[in-house]
Amino acid sequence: MKFSENWLRSHVPIQATRDELAATLTAIGLEVEEVIPLGESLGQVVVARIVEAMRHPEADRLQVCSVDAGQGELLQIVCGAPNARPGLVAPLALVGAKIGELTITAAKLRGVASNGMLCSAKELGLDSDAAGLFELPDDAPVGQALAEYLGLPDASIEIKLTPNRADCFSVRGIAFDVAAACASEVVAFDAGAVAPVSTRTLAVELDAGKDAPRYCGRVIEGIDPAAKTPVWLAERLRRSGVRPVSLLVDITQYVMLELGQPMHAFDLDTLHGPIGVRRSCAGEQLALLDGRQVTLDDSFLTIADAGRPVALAGLMGGLDTRVTETTRNVFLESAYFDPAAIMGRGRKLGLHTDAGHRFERGVDPALPPQAIEVATRLVLELAGGTPGPVVHAQLPQHLPQPARILLRRARIARVLGIQIDDVDVVRMLRALGMQLDAVAEGWEVMAPSRRFDIAIEEDLIEDLARIHGYDRVPTTLPGGASRIAMPSETQLDELSVRRQLVARELQETINYAFVDAALLERWQLTNGLVPLANPLSAELAIMRPCLLPGLVATLGRNAARQAGRVRLFELGKVFAAAADAGAAPQESQHVAAAVCGDALALQWGEAARKVDFHDVKGDLMALAAASGAQLEFQPSTQPFGHPGRSADIYRDGVCIGWIGQVHPRLAKALDIDVDVIAFELQLGPLVQRTLPCAGELSRFPSVRRDLAFLVPDEVSWAAVSASVRTTVGPLLREVQLFDRYVGQGVAPGFKSLAMGLILQDNSRTLTDRDVDAVVTDVVAVIEREHRARIRS
């Protein structure tokens, strides 16, 4: 946003110097990128009129001009500008004037005396236009100092706006922030209604719903087509980076820069029937002001009359309905469009306009009626004409409504770390145009309609911090006591789990929390899935229901790259759809491991062998031992597991996971040609541990008895050991499985389990009779409950 310093000061009277103003703007978040001083050294430059222009006798491109500079006699000036002509009013630098680094002196050019220099806008440092002399209006007072005539000195200030500050795309919007920061007040603005003189109107229809909820239009007839843009208006535009075009166009640009409301002027005689806002039809064509013919789709908003689109709403007017040097009747448009309806439409067509930039960020929905009155007043003042009544069409239900926000004193102090006096809070917020009502906790605040960025309490606090001054917030070091968190005695932390698995020679991996739906179908995991609304890609469209699919896929990629021994683990969240529709998905923390290849690293002391179920179960049992968890294993029916080499994992009777070999059919589908052994279980139940209780150490010796049973294949060791513990009771210190045998001497369908019973009493030495009685009971129970028999 570029603007004139003097224009800003006309809206907010402040005593700050130019440098102080620039520093203030940057301090309140309106970062100043450039300040260009204008007219600093034009003391001897005056308004002059060329009375006569003759061709230079020695140079085809030079003219010898007789110039009236208001000094009573004509001055002879040699000039090479292509637009030098009799009657032209232009700036004249007198002898002795300093223009930039050049001091003007009397000189001879190709043998002809020249007593000054007629100047272009670029030579004066007022504009980049160097094509010819700076043409001034014909009624400019000859002899008057140019600086006085143009309202100089001045400066062109350019600021960089953040996307949330669309309200500062206007001089008046910036003025509110400056007034608040400088403890001043914004000058009252006259936007009173202009009384209609005629009854001529143009009907307005709104057919775009919430995308265009407000549209104002006014007919002005009989304007003077020869009226020119006055120098004060043209200079304000020029210093704001806008090149003057024609009076009507310049007025709409002026209103946009001053108030922030983009406008458009149509030649009324080119419009047919009612005008309105509607969606474009696919394939519809429109000739734009820049001469391009564009083909529209149905995503564009258009301004249309009874038979055709006449403008791209919020972006650019149409070529066929533009105002020209012959326009006598005009229709002024001022509207509010929803930012989402304009956003991105210009880029589709390669357009970037000031109007589109403002509408994309958000324009004050209350501005259209004010802007059309201001524009009307300027048209009548500068070009005459007869105004009709304003036609105001709106859909109130779709207009943004400012919210009332509770601003608490305590919250201000908590967020900023400083206490701001109530009187300063009220002064700053009112200077920003906000309405305040005092309440017990602080204030109820309603932001002005131009402030789209004010939605919550913290937005108001941010404004207070900006205006109060970030440099006035004291620098303090963080305080407070540091508390050392004691490690939980009832739960193993995740770091300990990681360390335990690393100690077992597993390497941690981190995979995406999103997986491919096709991969889950291969694993036959299709229930309770959580799809993503906006996935990164089609292959990452589902939140993972478990860790194993991603972990095994990673293992497969490593195995395919000649890794002979792969041992991976992962800790992470898994996700499941909630039972109640509409509820948030359920999250839980899991731990998983997957291994393949050699059981041990290659060495001379151990024979090479492949990893098997019992190796991975050993890793799991070591992990469980860290928390004291007593795990049980039962045959699993999971479809992704090998039917004879997988088990469900239980703790305290609750299934918490799975361990086993990945089904060969699944491994083949995943292009993995080695056996993969894996486990996954819920982390929460695994890491819970019971506080150890100190018990009495027996002073009496323990006794060991070894027993071997022939049991059916389907009977698990877990079931047998549970029967032993229940039968023996407190005398049992430990039961150990030290042999499992299937083969010669054992009938088909049976297996031999050899166990060691370690018995001990705290009060006496066990006798042979005591031990024999226990053994007898154990044998009887196992034979009865498990159809087993003692092996001789």
From Swiss-Prot:
Q: Check the record and name the InterPro entries matching this protein.
A: aa-tRNA-synth_II/BPL/LPL, B3/B4_tRNA-bd, DNA-bd_dom_put_sf, Fdx_antiC-bd, Fdx_antiC-bd_sf, NA-bd_OB-fold, Phe-tRNA-ligase_IIc_bsu, Phe-tRNA-ligase_IIc_bsu_bact
Supply the EC number(s): 6.1.1.20
Recall the GO molecular function terms of this protein's record.
ATP binding; magnesium ion binding; phenylalanine-tRNA ligase activity; tRNA binding
Q: What is its main location?
A: cytoplasm
> tRNA-binding domain location, by residue?
39-147
Coiled coil ranges: none
Q: Which residues form the B5 domain?
A: 400-475
What does it catalyze? tRNA(Phe) + L-phenylalanine + ATP = L-phenylalanyl-tRNA(Phe) + AMP + diphosphate + H(+)
How many cofactor units bind, and how? Binds 2 magnesium ions per tetramer.
The cofactors it requires, by name, are: Mg(2+)
For this UniProt record, give its keywords in alphabetical order, as a comma-separated list: Aminoacyl-tRNA synthetase, ATP-binding, Cytoplasm, Ligase, Magnesium, Metal-binding, Nucleotide-binding, Protein biosynthesis, RNA-binding, tRNA-binding
Which domain of life does the protein's organism represent? Answer: Bacteria
Positions binding Mg(2+) in this chain are: D453, D459, E462, D463
- Residues in domain FDX-ACB? 698-791
Provide one Gene Ontology cellular component: phenylalanine-tRNA ligase complex
Q: Where does it localize?
A: Cytoplasm
List the Pfam families hit by this protein, alphabetically: B3_4, B5, FDX-ACB, tRNA_bind, tRNA_synthFbeta
Question: Mind listing the GO biological process terms from this record?
Answer: phenylalanyl-tRNA aminoacylation
- NCBIfam families, alphabetically? pheT_bact (TIGR00472), YtpR (NF045760)
Assembly behavior: Tetramer of two alpha and two beta subunits.
- Give the protein family: Belongs to the phenylalanyl-tRNA synthetase beta subunit family. Type 1 subfamily.
Q: What is this protein called?
A: Phenylalanine--tRNA ligase beta subunit
Organism source for this protein?
Xanthomonas oryzae pv. oryzae (strain KACC10331 / KXO85)
Originating gene: pheT
